[in-house]
Amino acid sequence: MTDAAIAEKDLGNAAYKQKDFEKAHVHYDKAIELDPSNITFYNNKAAVYFEEKKFAECVQFCEKAVEVGRETRADYKLIAKAMSRAGNAFQKQNDLSLAVQWFHRSLSEFRDPELVKKVKELEKQLKAAERLAYINPELAQEEKNKGNEYFKKGDYPTAMRHYNEAVKRDPENAILYSNRAACLTKLMEFQRALDDCDTCIRLDSKFIKGYIRKAACLVAMREWSKAQRAYEDALQVDPSNEEAREGVRNCLRSNDEDPEKAKERSLADPEVQEILRDPGMRMILEQMSNDPGAVREHLKNPEIFQKLMKLRDAGVIQMR
Protein backbone atom coordinates (compact mmCIF):
# COMPACT_ATOMS: atom_id res chain seq x y z
CA MET A 1 0.00 0.00 0.00
CA THR A 2 1.70 3.19 -1.18
CA ASP A 3 1.57 6.44 0.77
CA ALA A 4 -0.15 8.16 -2.14
CA ALA A 5 -2.83 5.47 -2.27
CA ILE A 6 -3.39 5.77 1.50
CA ALA A 7 -3.72 9.52 1.17
CA GLU A 8 -6.39 9.13 -1.53
CA LYS A 9 -8.23 6.57 0.60
CA ASP A 10 -8.22 8.96 3.58
CA LEU A 11 -9.59 11.77 1.41
CA GLY A 12 -12.25 9.37 0.17
CA ASN A 13 -13.17 8.45 3.75
CA ALA A 14 -13.49 12.11 4.69
CA ALA A 15 -15.77 12.76 1.72
CA TYR A 16 -17.81 9.65 2.57
CA LYS A 17 -18.39 10.86 6.13
CA GLN A 18 -19.61 14.18 4.73
CA LYS A 19 -21.89 12.24 2.35
CA ASP A 20 -20.11 13.76 -0.63
CA PHE A 21 -20.30 10.49 -2.50
CA GLU A 22 -19.21 11.81 -5.88
CA LYS A 23 -15.98 13.13 -4.37
CA ALA A 24 -15.50 9.89 -2.41
CA HIS A 25 -15.69 7.90 -5.66
CA VAL A 26 -13.04 10.09 -7.25
CA HIS A 27 -10.57 9.53 -4.41
CA TYR A 28 -11.24 5.80 -4.10
CA ASP A 29 -10.78 5.42 -7.87
CA LYS A 30 -7.41 7.14 -7.59
CA ALA A 31 -6.44 4.89 -4.67
CA ILE A 32 -7.34 1.82 -6.75
CA GLU A 33 -5.37 3.16 -9.68
CA LEU A 34 -2.32 3.65 -7.46
CA ASP A 35 -2.69 0.28 -5.72
CA PRO A 36 -5.10 -2.11 -7.49
CA SER A 37 -4.19 -4.99 -5.15
CA ASN A 38 -5.74 -3.53 -1.99
CA ILE A 39 -9.10 -5.06 -1.02
CA THR A 40 -9.97 -2.14 1.29
CA PHE A 41 -10.28 0.33 -1.59
CA TYR A 42 -12.83 -1.88 -3.37
CA ASN A 43 -14.73 -2.42 -0.12
CA ASN A 44 -14.87 1.32 0.46
CA LYS A 45 -16.10 2.04 -3.04
CA ALA A 46 -18.79 -0.65 -2.61
CA ALA A 47 -19.86 1.11 0.60
CA VAL A 48 -20.36 4.37 -1.32
CA TYR A 49 -22.54 2.63 -3.92
CA PHE A 50 -24.55 1.07 -1.09
CA GLU A 51 -25.24 4.48 0.44
CA GLU A 52 -26.23 5.77 -2.99
CA LYS A 53 -28.67 2.83 -3.27
CA LYS A 54 -26.86 1.71 -6.41
CA PHE A 55 -27.01 -1.90 -5.33
CA ALA A 56 -26.00 -3.58 -8.60
CA GLU A 57 -22.77 -1.51 -8.66
CA CYS A 58 -22.27 -2.24 -4.96
CA VAL A 59 -22.42 -6.00 -5.57
CA GLN A 60 -20.08 -5.66 -8.55
CA PHE A 61 -17.40 -4.03 -6.39
CA CYS A 62 -17.99 -6.50 -3.55
CA GLU A 63 -17.27 -9.32 -6.01
CA LYS A 64 -14.15 -7.49 -7.18
CA ALA A 65 -13.07 -7.03 -3.56
CA VAL A 66 -13.44 -10.78 -2.94
CA GLU A 67 -11.49 -11.57 -6.11
CA VAL A 68 -8.64 -9.21 -5.17
CA GLY A 69 -8.71 -10.45 -1.58
CA ARG A 70 -8.34 -14.06 -2.70
CA GLU A 71 -5.47 -13.20 -5.05
CA THR A 72 -3.57 -11.27 -2.38
CA ARG A 73 -4.51 -13.55 0.54
CA ALA A 74 -6.08 -10.66 2.38
CA ASP A 75 -7.40 -10.87 5.94
CA TYR A 76 -10.42 -13.21 5.92
CA LYS A 77 -12.40 -10.59 7.87
CA LEU A 78 -12.05 -8.15 4.97
CA ILE A 79 -13.25 -10.79 2.51
CA ALA A 80 -16.15 -11.60 4.85
CA LYS A 81 -16.98 -7.89 5.00
CA ALA A 82 -17.27 -7.67 1.21
CA MET A 83 -19.51 -10.75 1.10
CA SER A 84 -21.69 -9.44 3.91
CA ARG A 85 -22.14 -6.10 2.15
CA ALA A 86 -23.19 -7.90 -1.04
CA GLY A 87 -25.75 -9.75 1.07
CA ASN A 88 -27.02 -6.46 2.47
CA ALA A 89 -27.36 -5.08 -1.06
CA PHE A 90 -29.49 -8.05 -2.13
CA GLN A 91 -31.56 -7.74 1.05
CA LYS A 92 -32.25 -4.09 0.21
CA GLN A 93 -33.55 -5.29 -3.16
CA ASN A 94 -35.81 -7.82 -1.36
CA ASP A 95 -33.90 -10.74 -2.88
CA LEU A 96 -33.68 -12.66 0.38
CA SER A 97 -32.52 -15.87 -1.26
CA LEU A 98 -29.36 -14.31 -2.72
CA ALA A 99 -28.87 -12.26 0.43
CA VAL A 100 -28.79 -15.43 2.55
CA GLN A 101 -26.40 -17.09 0.09
CA TRP A 102 -23.94 -14.19 0.41
CA PHE A 103 -24.31 -14.08 4.19
CA HIS A 104 -23.50 -17.79 4.41
CA ARG A 105 -20.41 -17.20 2.27
CA SER A 106 -19.42 -14.41 4.64
CA LEU A 107 -19.91 -16.63 7.68
CA SER A 108 -17.68 -19.28 6.11
CA GLU A 109 -14.87 -16.69 6.20
CA PHE A 110 -15.64 -15.19 9.61
CA ARG A 111 -18.40 -16.25 12.03
CA ASP A 112 -19.85 -12.95 13.15
CA PRO A 113 -22.42 -13.70 15.93
CA GLU A 114 -24.66 -10.82 14.89
CA LEU A 115 -24.71 -12.02 11.29
CA VAL A 116 -25.58 -15.54 12.49
CA LYS A 117 -28.70 -14.13 14.21
CA LYS A 118 -29.58 -12.10 11.14
CA VAL A 119 -29.32 -15.12 8.84
CA LYS A 120 -31.57 -17.21 11.10
CA GLU A 121 -34.23 -14.52 11.02
CA LEU A 122 -33.96 -14.11 7.24
CA GLU A 123 -34.24 -17.87 6.75
CA LYS A 124 -37.47 -17.83 8.78
CA GLN A 125 -38.78 -15.04 6.55
CA LEU A 126 -37.75 -16.99 3.45
CA LYS A 127 -39.57 -20.13 4.57
CA ALA A 128 -42.66 -18.11 5.43
CA ALA A 129 -42.56 -16.44 2.01
CA GLU A 130 -42.12 -19.80 0.28
CA ARG A 131 -45.09 -21.26 2.16
CA LEU A 132 -47.19 -18.23 1.28
CA ALA A 133 -46.22 -18.44 -2.38
CA TYR A 134 -47.11 -22.14 -2.38
CA ILE A 135 -50.67 -21.57 -1.19
CA ASN A 136 -53.26 -22.35 -3.86
CA PRO A 137 -56.75 -23.37 -2.66
CA GLU A 138 -57.76 -24.66 -6.10
CA LEU A 139 -54.82 -27.06 -6.26
CA ALA A 140 -55.50 -28.01 -2.64
CA GLN A 141 -59.02 -29.05 -3.63
CA GLU A 142 -57.65 -31.16 -6.48
CA GLU A 143 -55.23 -32.90 -4.12
CA LYS A 144 -58.00 -33.46 -1.57
CA ASN A 145 -60.20 -35.07 -4.23
CA LYS A 146 -57.34 -37.36 -5.27
CA GLY A 147 -56.76 -38.25 -1.63
CA ASN A 148 -60.44 -39.09 -1.21
CA GLU A 149 -60.31 -41.41 -4.23
CA TYR A 150 -57.36 -43.37 -2.86
CA PHE A 151 -58.91 -43.38 0.62
CA LYS A 152 -62.04 -45.05 -0.76
CA LYS A 153 -59.85 -47.66 -2.47
CA GLY A 154 -58.10 -48.39 0.82
CA ASP A 155 -54.75 -47.12 -0.48
CA TYR A 156 -54.07 -45.00 2.59
CA PRO A 157 -50.34 -44.25 2.04
CA THR A 158 -51.10 -42.75 -1.39
CA ALA A 159 -54.09 -40.90 0.04
CA MET A 160 -51.78 -39.45 2.71
CA ARG A 161 -49.41 -38.04 0.08
CA HIS A 162 -52.29 -36.16 -1.52
CA TYR A 163 -53.70 -34.96 1.80
CA ASN A 164 -50.24 -33.72 2.82
CA GLU A 165 -49.97 -31.76 -0.41
CA ALA A 166 -53.48 -30.37 0.06
CA VAL A 167 -52.59 -29.08 3.55
CA LYS A 168 -49.45 -27.39 2.21
CA ARG A 169 -51.51 -25.72 -0.51
CA ASP A 170 -54.22 -24.49 1.88
CA PRO A 171 -52.98 -24.67 5.50
CA GLU A 172 -55.93 -22.73 6.96
CA ASN A 173 -58.58 -25.13 5.62
CA ALA A 174 -60.02 -27.10 8.56
CA ILE A 175 -61.60 -29.78 6.34
CA LEU A 176 -58.20 -30.87 5.01
CA TYR A 177 -56.93 -31.67 8.51
CA SER A 178 -60.11 -33.63 9.19
CA ASN A 179 -59.59 -35.74 6.06
CA ARG A 180 -55.94 -36.33 6.85
CA ALA A 181 -56.84 -37.30 10.42
CA ALA A 182 -59.20 -39.97 9.10
CA CYS A 183 -56.40 -41.34 6.93
CA LEU A 184 -53.88 -41.27 9.79
CA THR A 185 -56.34 -43.18 11.96
CA LYS A 186 -56.54 -45.89 9.28
CA LEU A 187 -52.74 -46.01 9.29
CA MET A 188 -52.86 -46.30 13.10
CA GLU A 189 -50.85 -43.11 13.56
CA PHE A 190 -53.17 -42.01 16.32
CA GLN A 191 -51.19 -39.17 17.91
CA ARG A 192 -50.70 -37.46 14.57
CA ALA A 193 -54.40 -37.97 13.85
CA LEU A 194 -55.31 -36.32 17.16
CA ASP A 195 -53.00 -33.40 16.37
CA ASP A 196 -54.77 -32.90 13.03
CA CYS A 197 -58.18 -33.09 14.72
CA ASP A 198 -57.13 -30.45 17.24
CA THR A 199 -55.89 -28.21 14.41
CA CYS A 200 -59.16 -28.74 12.56
CA ILE A 201 -61.16 -27.75 15.65
CA ARG A 202 -58.94 -24.72 16.26
CA LEU A 203 -59.46 -23.51 12.69
CA ASP A 204 -63.22 -24.12 12.71
CA SER A 205 -64.83 -24.87 16.07
CA LYS A 206 -68.23 -25.35 14.39
CA PHE A 207 -67.05 -28.09 12.02
CA ILE A 208 -68.56 -31.14 13.70
CA LYS A 209 -66.49 -33.73 11.81
CA GLY A 210 -63.39 -32.51 13.63
CA TYR A 211 -64.85 -33.64 16.95
CA ILE A 212 -66.30 -36.87 15.57
CA ARG A 213 -63.01 -37.87 13.95
CA LYS A 214 -61.17 -37.04 17.14
CA ALA A 215 -63.59 -39.31 19.01
CA ALA A 216 -63.14 -42.07 16.42
CA CYS A 217 -59.39 -41.89 16.85
CA LEU A 218 -59.71 -42.08 20.63
CA VAL A 219 -62.08 -45.05 20.29
CA ALA A 220 -59.43 -46.80 18.19
CA MET A 221 -57.01 -46.13 21.05
CA ARG A 222 -59.63 -47.48 23.49
CA GLU A 223 -59.59 -44.16 25.33
CA TRP A 224 -63.30 -44.38 26.11
CA SER A 225 -63.63 -41.44 28.49
CA LYS A 226 -61.75 -39.08 26.20
CA ALA A 227 -63.72 -40.31 23.21
CA GLN A 228 -66.95 -39.74 25.09
CA ARG A 229 -65.91 -36.14 25.82
CA ALA A 230 -65.10 -35.57 22.14
CA TYR A 231 -68.55 -36.87 21.16
CA GLU A 232 -70.10 -34.62 23.80
CA ASP A 233 -68.21 -31.66 22.33
CA ALA A 234 -69.69 -32.58 18.95
CA LEU A 235 -73.16 -32.51 20.50
CA GLN A 236 -72.46 -28.99 21.72
CA VAL A 237 -72.17 -28.03 18.04
CA ASP A 238 -75.16 -30.09 16.91
CA PRO A 239 -77.29 -31.66 19.68
CA SER A 240 -79.24 -33.71 17.13
CA ASN A 241 -76.22 -35.39 15.51
CA GLU A 242 -77.02 -39.09 15.67
CA GLU A 243 -73.44 -40.26 15.08
CA ALA A 244 -72.25 -38.32 18.13
CA ARG A 245 -75.17 -39.49 20.26
CA GLU A 246 -74.55 -43.11 19.31
CA GLY A 247 -70.84 -42.56 19.99
CA VAL A 248 -71.57 -41.44 23.55
CA ARG A 249 -73.74 -44.52 24.14
CA ASN A 250 -71.06 -46.85 22.78
CA CYS A 251 -68.37 -45.25 24.95
CA LEU A 252 -70.53 -45.64 28.05
CA ARG A 253 -71.13 -49.32 27.22
CA SER A 254 -67.44 -49.94 26.55
CA ASN A 255 -66.47 -48.29 29.83
CA ASP A 256 -68.91 -50.51 31.70
CA GLU A 257 -67.91 -53.76 30.00
CA ASP A 258 -64.62 -54.51 31.77
CA PRO A 259 -63.55 -51.76 34.20
CA GLU A 260 -60.61 -53.73 35.63
CA LYS A 261 -59.15 -54.27 32.18
CA ALA A 262 -59.66 -50.60 31.33
CA LYS A 263 -57.97 -49.62 34.60
CA GLU A 264 -55.02 -51.90 33.87
CA ARG A 265 -54.60 -50.34 30.44
CA SER A 266 -54.87 -46.82 31.87
CA LEU A 267 -52.24 -47.57 34.52
CA ALA A 268 -49.82 -48.33 31.69
CA ASP A 269 -50.26 -44.75 30.46
CA PRO A 270 -46.89 -42.92 31.00
CA GLU A 271 -48.77 -39.76 32.05
CA VAL A 272 -50.68 -41.67 34.75
CA GLN A 273 -47.46 -43.33 35.92
CA GLU A 274 -45.72 -39.95 36.16
CA ILE A 275 -48.59 -38.51 38.25
CA LEU A 276 -48.50 -41.49 40.61
CA ARG A 277 -44.71 -41.14 41.04
CA ASP A 278 -45.05 -37.47 42.01
CA PRO A 279 -44.49 -37.26 45.83
CA GLY A 280 -46.80 -34.24 46.07
CA MET A 281 -49.63 -36.04 44.28
CA ARG A 282 -49.12 -39.16 46.39
CA MET A 283 -49.51 -37.04 49.53
CA ILE A 284 -52.71 -35.48 48.11
CA LEU A 285 -54.12 -38.94 47.28
CA GLU A 286 -53.34 -40.11 50.82
CA GLN A 287 -55.15 -37.05 52.23
CA MET A 288 -58.14 -37.80 50.02
CA SER A 289 -58.29 -41.42 51.21
CA ASN A 290 -58.34 -40.25 54.85
CA ASP A 291 -60.56 -37.22 54.28
CA PRO A 292 -62.64 -37.26 51.05
CA GLY A 293 -63.60 -33.63 51.68
CA ALA A 294 -59.95 -32.56 51.22
CA VAL A 295 -60.35 -32.87 47.46
CA ARG A 296 -62.35 -29.64 47.29
CA GLU A 297 -59.37 -27.54 48.30
CA HIS A 298 -57.06 -29.27 45.86
CA LEU A 299 -59.49 -28.81 42.97
CA LYS A 300 -58.92 -25.05 43.21
CA ASN A 301 -55.43 -25.59 41.79
CA PRO A 302 -55.79 -25.96 37.95
CA GLU A 303 -52.69 -28.16 37.62
CA ILE A 304 -53.79 -30.54 40.38
CA PHE A 305 -57.34 -30.52 39.02
CA GLN A 306 -56.09 -31.74 35.61
CA LYS A 307 -54.01 -34.48 37.22
CA LEU A 308 -56.92 -35.65 39.37
CA MET A 309 -59.19 -35.72 36.32
CA LYS A 310 -56.59 -37.84 34.53
CA LEU A 311 -56.51 -40.28 37.44
CA ARG A 312 -60.29 -40.34 37.57
CA ASP A 313 -60.52 -41.13 33.84
CA ALA A 314 -57.93 -43.86 34.34
CA GLY A 315 -60.09 -45.43 37.05
CA VAL A 316 -57.39 -44.91 39.70
CA ILE A 317 -59.66 -42.75 41.85
CA GLN A 318 -63.37 -42.11 42.05
CA MET A 319 -64.78 -38.62 42.25
CA ARG A 320 -68.38 -37.52 42.32
From Swiss-Prot:
Induction statement: Up-regulated by heat stress (at protein level).
Chief subcellular location: cytoplasm
Ranges of the TPR repeats in the UniProt entry: 5-38, 40-72, 80-113, 140-173, 175-207, 208-241
GO cellular component: cytoplasm; protein folding chaperone complex
Keywords, ordered alphabetically: Cytoplasm, Developmental protein, Repeat, Stress response, TPR repeat
Compositionally biased tracts (Basic and acidic residues): 242-269
Annotated stretches, region: Disordered: 241-269
Annotated GO MF terms: ATPase inhibitor activity; Hsp70 protein binding; Hsp90 protein binding
Phenotype of gene-disrupted mutants: Reduced brood size and decreased fertility under heat stress. Decreased thermotolerance and shortening of life span by 68% and 77% at 20 degrees Celsius and 25 degrees Celsius respectively. Growth of gonads is hampered resulting in shortened arms of the gonads, abnormally shaped spermathecae, lower sperm number and endomitotic oocyte development.
Subunit structure: Forms a complex with hsp-1/hsp70 and daf-21/hsp90. Interacts with daf-21/hsp90 (via the C-terminal MEEVD pentapeptide).
Function as written in the Swiss-Prot or TrEMBL entry: Plays a role in gonad development. Up-regulates longevity and thermotolerance. Binds daf-21/hsp90 and inhibits its ATPase activity.
Protein name: Stress-induced-phosphoprotein 1
Gene source species: Caenorhabditis elegans
